[in-house]
Structures are given as structure tokens and as C-alpha cells.
Regions:
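Histidine/acidic residue-rich metal-binding segments in metalloenzymes
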Residues: 2-90, 95-114
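Glycine-rich, acidic/polar active-site loops that bind/position phosphate-bearing ligands
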Residues: 116-259
Length: 259
């Protein structure tokens, strides 16, 4: 469980005690992370990722397009005179990135070169490793927020983080009124939808309504509605069981406690 996640136990094991303590302080209290601390964290994160087979890293964020966005950069720097290369990853590269915001829809309101967007490392979410599109390589994913030059949220995560901070502030205020003087933080829990429909790819590609809208817009009702046992409590077919086995294993590797 969590073998592909740079989680708290990995950080505690690999980071110097002072660095680990400062990073935890940043995570828990929202304090600014010093550059020297970020450099050490970046180095250990890179070494851990390389040991896991990663060659690239990505600032991973959720823009307002409804999908995730990522830009892959290699750990390998320019070759030296002897032809050898260095595997580098600095604290500056960890903490902040500058993807081109002109890659996203703007309605033509701004010139391309003025569409500035910045990714900022969200250290409250652990970095993780996933296989690349070929299935043979691996990429270090660094969860980030995506903001404009003046601080406007350009993604789904920034409003979530700000909402969590607002809830924390007011919940702590209420706890103090009730006499609780020990709690330091209130953290809400959010999760993905627990119910979904699994459709065979061959059948899915024949249904334009599913492709374009994600739901059924036409088709006949079942002969008996839902009176039979072929829906929620039907027998699980072998292909579906194997699919769920793969899903569970991949989620567990990423530290997701799928039920």
C-alpha cells in the first residue's frame, strides 16, 4: 500500500530530521518553505523517483477544462564536455513552474505571450509515481495548484484549498468557543463518486450518446425494469473481476484506500 507515493513515512526515512520537521511545519501550518529546505526535499524526491524507475517529472494540476494537465520535464541536464550527464532537480523546480496558459481556452481575450500561468507545489498532497503512456517508463507527478500572475485561480484545486482553509479557520474558532484548546487543525475529507457504470469498450464505441455526453440518451427500457437480479446484485463476470483487481492494485500503490 502506497509503495509509489512519497508519503510521510518515506519523508521521515529519507529526509534529515531538521528538514523533515520544517516541511511538516509547512504542511500543517501553511508556513513558507525556505529555499534551502526545498532543495533538500527536491534532491531526496528525485533520488527516490529514480530508484523507482522515473526519468521525468511533471507539475500535475487540474485546469478548468475538466481534465488534468501535465508537462513532462526530464531529470537529465545538458551533457558535460566528457559526454556524461547529470540528473538534477532543484527546489526551485519543485516549488514553482511556469506552464504556458495560452494552451488553454481564453476566448481570444489576451495575446498569447501575455497568457501567464504558474504552478505552485501543493505540499499537503504527496508526490507519486505513475507509468507513462507506453507502460515501460515512469514519471514523478508533483501535485500543484495553477494560478495567474495576480493570484486568480485557474484550476479546480486552488478553490478547494482555499475552502479547506476557510473551514479550518471557522471550525477552530467554534472549537475554542466549546472549550477545546488543543486542536490545531480541522481537515475535511473529500472523495470520488463511489458508484459508476462499467461498459465494454466495443459496445461503448457504438454509442455516440455515451461518447459525447457520458450518459444514455436513447435506447429501450429493460424488459422488466429492475425487478430481476441482473443489476446491483448480479453475478460478477470474470472480466469485470479482473478489471477491478487491476484497479484496486493500482489505487493501493498510490495510497488510495479504495473500498
Amino acid at each position: 500500500f502506497g509503495e509509489n507515493v512519497f508519503n510521510d513515512s518515506v519523508m521521515q526515512e529519507r529526509l534529515p530530521k531538521k528538514v523533515y520537521k520544517e516541511l511538516k511545519r509547512t504542511i500543517q501550518e501553511g508556513k513558507e518553505l525556505e529555499q534551502s529546505i526545498a532543495d533538500v526535499v527536491a534532491h531526496e524526491m528525485k533520488e527516490w523517483a529514480i530508484e523507482k524507475g522515473a526519468t521525468h517529472y511533471s507539475h500535475w494540476f487540474q485546469p478548468l477544462t475538466g481534465a488534468t494537465a501535465e508537462k513532462h520535464d526530464s531529470f537529465i541536464s545538458a551533457p558535460k564536455s566528457d559526454g556524461k550527464v547529470l540528473m538534477e532537480f532543484s527546489g526551485k523546480e519543485l516549488v514553482k513552474g511556469e506552464p504556458d496558459a495560452s494552451s488553454f481556452p481564453s476566448g481570444g481575450l489576451r495575446a498569447t505571450f501575455e497568457a501567464r500561468g504558474y504552478t505552485a507545489w501543493d505540499c499537503t498532497s504527496p508526490a507519486f509515481i505513475k507509468k507513462d503512456a507506453t507502460g515501460t517508463g515512469a514519471i514523478l507527478y508533483i501535485p500543484t495548484a495553477f494560478c495567474s500572475y495576480t493570484g486568480e485561480a485557474l484550476d479546480q484545486k486552488t478553490p478547494l484549498l482555499r475552502s479547506m482553509e476557510a473551514i479550518n479557520k471557522q471550525a477552530l474558532r467554534l472549537l475554542r468557543l466549546f472549550g477545546n484548546t488543543t486542536s490545531q487543525r480541522v481537515t475535511p475529507s473529500v472523495g470520488a463518486e463511489q458508484e459508476y457504470f462499467l461498459v465494454d469498450r466495443e459496445k461503448y464505441l457504438k454509442r455516440k450518446d455515451l461518447i459525447f455526453t457520458g450518459r444514455t440518451l436513447f435506447g429501450a427500457m429493460p424488459p422488466k425494469g429492475q425487478e430481476l437480479d441482473d443489476h446491483y446484485f448480479g453475478a460478477i463476470r470474470e472480466r469485470i473481476a479482473l478489471f477491478m483487481k487491476d484497479v484496486n492494485e493500482e489505487l493501493w500503490k498510490l495510497g488510495v484506500s479504495a473500498k
